[in-house]
Structures are given as structure tokens and as C-alpha cells.
């Protein structure tokens, strides 16, 4: 499950991506992003800082400053964002790529039936989320994209 913070980050990125597609894109202020996305401004400031540190958005100072998308939507990996914003995504610590820890109550990882079942579910999830980009999320809200698929 993704956190509310991650949902806010995705909403902000979708607004920035929509703005980047306009004929004359402008940097968006935190207020504009908050209004367009329905995200509380007080959370957005911290989230945009995290996204800037991750190299996904740029901040521009000055009168016409604000935030803009630094990468093309197809180059923004959703799984990398989830890990950056929410931390490890594995359902068990013994399945985590980045924060592996053996389970305290497990004596034999290779024979653990709980691990085996959740590993199968998790790997299926990883195949999907590792291939997901911001571009995919933009297309999900576009009725024309569905027509092109048929």
C-alpha cells in the first residue's frame, strides 16, 4: 500500500507533467500545484523538496519561479519514487532489496512457507510496478489513449 504522502507526490507530478505538455509551459508555484491537485500546501513543500533531491523536479527562484518537471514522464519510474518517498516496498523484511533483514522468528528462510508465498506475490507486483512510469499514469486518465489501444 502506498502512503498518503506518495499519493500527494504523484498528484503533484501529474500536474507538473500536464503543464509540461502545454504549448507554453510555465513553472508552477506550490500554491498552483496544491490548488490543481487538491493537495495540502504544507505537505507539498516537503514532498517537492524530496522530488528535487531525487532529480525529478527543478525549482526556479524569482518572480516567475516555481517547480517544473526535470525528466520526461517516460523516464520517471514509479517504483523508484515509491522507494524514495515511502521506503522499502517489500511485504516482508527478508524480501527487501534495499533493506533486507532476516525475520527474527524464522529459523530457515529457504523452507519458510510464509516467505515463499509472499515472494511469489511480491515478484509479480515488482514486475508490474518496475515497468510503470509517470507516462503510464498520464495515459491512464486520457480517454483517447483507450481508443488507441483498441
Swiss-Prot record:
PANTHER family, alphabetized: HTH-TYPE TRANSCRIPTIONAL REGULATOR ISCR (PTHR33221:SF5), WINGED HELIX-TURN-HELIX TRANSCRIPTIONAL REGULATOR, RRF2 FAMILY (PTHR33221)
- The protein here is known as Putative HTH-type transcriptional regulator rrf2-like
Q: Where is the signal peptide?
A: none
Instruction: Tell me the Gene3D superfamilies matching this sequence.
Output: Winged helix-like DNA-binding domain superfamily/Winged helix DNA-binding domain
Q: Which domain of life is it from?
A: Bacteria
| Family annotation (InterPro entries) | TR_Rrf2-type_CS, Tscrpt_reg_Rrf2, WH-like_DNA-bd_sf, WH_DNA-bd_sf
GO molecular function terms attached to this record = DNA binding; DNA-binding transcription factor activity
Q: Which residues form the HTH rrf2-type domain?
A: 1-139
Disulfide-linked positions: none
Keywords, ordered alphabetically: DNA-binding
User: Where is it found, in Gene Ontology cellular component terms?
Assistant: cytosol
Q: Is the DNA-binding keyword given for this protein?
A: yes
Keyword DNA-binding attached: yes
Coiled-coil intervals, chain numbering = none
